[in-house]
Design a protein with these regions (language model features):
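Short, compositionally biased P/S/T/A/G/V-rich stretches that sit at domain boundaries
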Residues: 25-60
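Short edge beta-strand/loop segments characteristic of extracellular beta-sandwich folds
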Residues: 63-70
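Conserved aromatic beta-strand anchor motif in extracellular beta-sandwich/beta-rich domains
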Residues: 80-84, 121
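Solvent-exposed serine/threonine-rich low-complexity stretches and specific carbohydrate-binding patches
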Residues: 89-99
Length: 137
């Protein structure tokens, strides 16, 4: 009987340790990192966004969705999904690596498409963790 109880306690303890040390799955509340900044800009220079805005001229050829993440718990991939008038126009997968701070970006050629645009940050399951709206006039 003592062996049986010890075995059950040992298995229970091992499962508890494994479950509490397993990497957290993505959720709306916790993507596995902190989003410090997610902005749309006209350029990225020296890993920093330049010309950040919500409105861009139709003459603007390309914009960037810049992401700064912090406290990344594990290596992962995220996607920046670009929408124009609620129609998906592009999906760019980007790596994010375990780190205190990570900066990355995706660019999108606007090809003169005026109207409402949106860039979404999605995890590998397609869950949206952040979005930025902007207008091309």
């Amino acid at each position: 009987m003592k062996i049986h109880i010890s075995l059950v306690l040992g298995i229970t303890t091992a499962l508890f340790v494994l479950m509490n040390n397993a990497p957290a799955a993505f959720s709306m509340d916790d993507p596995g990192f902190t989003i410090k900044r997610m902005v749309i800009s006209k350029d990225v220079v020296d890993r920093e966004p330049v010309g950040v805005g919500d409105f861009f001229s139709a003459a603007t050829e390309k914009v960037y969705c810049f992401l700064e993440a912090a406290d990344i718990e594990t290596d992962m991939q995220v996607s920046i999904v670009w929408y124009w008038s609620n129609q998906e126009m592009a999906r760019v997968t980007l790596p994010i690596q375990t780190s205190r701070r990570w900066r990355t970006y995706s660019s999108k050629k606007l090809v003169g498409l005026k109207g409402n645009w949106r860039a979404e940050l999605q995890d590998s399951s397609g869950i949206v963790h952040n979005s930025v709206n902007f207008v091309v006039e």
